[in-house]
């Protein structure tokens, strides 16, 4: 860790179509090899499918999915006296959102299916309904933190 100064957080501009920072963050995480236009196309098609399937505002569905998948606590490895403990720590809102987005995208990439659009759509709908792989991952992290609650005294 640098001792000089903390780096400034990046300013994320809102998405031009939906005026949402969350959409822009998702597009940046979907993007591979710098192909942002492809990532935008995938995400916008997924948004249209969400609108057709749920008859709701797709941005609200996506926000609900991220809110549901956001962890409250996580565990970090900490060496104390030659042994490593999994120490539970609270998650900051920014990190929680980043983890939720990462887990949703990992879950949709691991999903069986033909197109990324269909997988992304189904994962968003599942996460907004508190089901799916991203929610399982959040619950698993919460269980780990609860199981290691005795080591909370070793906080950083």
Curated annotation (Swiss-Prot):
GO terms for cellular component: chloroplast; small ribosomal subunit. This is Small ribosomal subunit protein uS7c. One of the primary rRNA binding proteins, it binds directly to 16S rRNA where it nucleates assembly of the head domain of the 30S subunit. The keyword rRNA-binding applies. Its main location: plastid. PROSITE patterns: RIBOSOMAL_S7 (PS00052). The keyword Cell membrane does not apply. Part of the 30S ribosomal subunit. It is found in: Plastid, Chloroplast.
């Amino acid at each position: 860790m640098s001792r000089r100064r903390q780096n400034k957080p990046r300013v994320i501009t809102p998405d031009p179509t939906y005026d949402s920072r969350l959409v822009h963050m998702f597009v940046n995480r979907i993007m591979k090899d710098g192909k942002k236009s492809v990532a935008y196309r995938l995400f916008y098609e997924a948004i249209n499918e969400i609108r057709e399937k749920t008859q709701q505002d797709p941005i609200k569905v996506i926000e609900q999915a991220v809110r549901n998948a956001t962890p409250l606590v996580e565990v970090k490895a900490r060496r104390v006296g030659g042994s490593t403990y999994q120490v539970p720590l609270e998650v900051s809102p920014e990190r929680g959102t980043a983890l939720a987005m990462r887990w949703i995208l990992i879950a949709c990439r691991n999903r069986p299916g033909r197109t990324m659009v269909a997988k992304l759509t189904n994962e968003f709908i599942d996460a907004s309904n508190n089901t799916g792989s991203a929610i399982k991952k959040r619950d698993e992290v919460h269980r780990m933190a609860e199981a290691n609650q005795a080591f909370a005294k070793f906080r950083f």
